[in-house]
Regions:
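Catalytic glycan-binding domains that act on GlcNAc-containing polysaccharides
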Residues: 20-135
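Cleavable N-terminal signal peptides
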Residues: 7-9, 19
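N-terminal signal peptide c-region/cleavage motif recognized by signal peptidases
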Residues: 14-18
Length: 135
């Protein structure tokens, strides 16, 4: 009897986590369309950064949300407040805003846009990557 009750609870949690993942996926897709980022690329980045989870936080930095946006990056993109306490939609908005800036700066080069999002905008202006941006 106890084992069945535990299974039902565990099953309920699994179903809930899938529902949250579907919501996060929908939020990421919506923001990608708004910001002009290819949806497949945006989902790939969210999967790499957080497994497409809204509540994901990096314990060693201020990164949080589906695109793991840093507090300083969110501020640079115009957010005021603590990004770690913001809603999933807000975190996705500012993370996607940064990813879109990287994507445009890389002129559609997804590998370079990925590096820019993960490392920083200075990647776009290094001598090594100037040729990639021209192409």
């Amino acid at each position: 009897m106890r084992l069945i009750a535990c299974s039902a609870v565990v099953l309920g949690l699994v179903v809930c986590s899938k529902a949250f993942a579907a919501d996060a996926s929908h939020i990421v897709k919506t923001e990608a369309r708004k910001q002009g980022v290819p949806v497949a690329f945006a989902l790939k980045m969210a999967r790499i950064e957080s497994g497409i989870k809204c509540g994901q936080r990096n314990p060693r930095s201020t990164a949080s949300g589906p695109l793991q946006v840093l507090k300083s990056t969110a501020r640079a993109m115009g957010y005021r407040g603590d990004i770690r306490r913001a809603s999933c939609a807000t975190q996705a908005h500012y993370g996607m805003k940064h990813l879109a800036m990287c994507y445009r700066g890389a002129r559609g080069n997804q590998a370079l846009a990925k590096r820019c999002h993960q490392v920083g905008v200075s990647v776009l202006y290094s001598k090594k990557n100037r040729k990639k941006r021209r192409g």
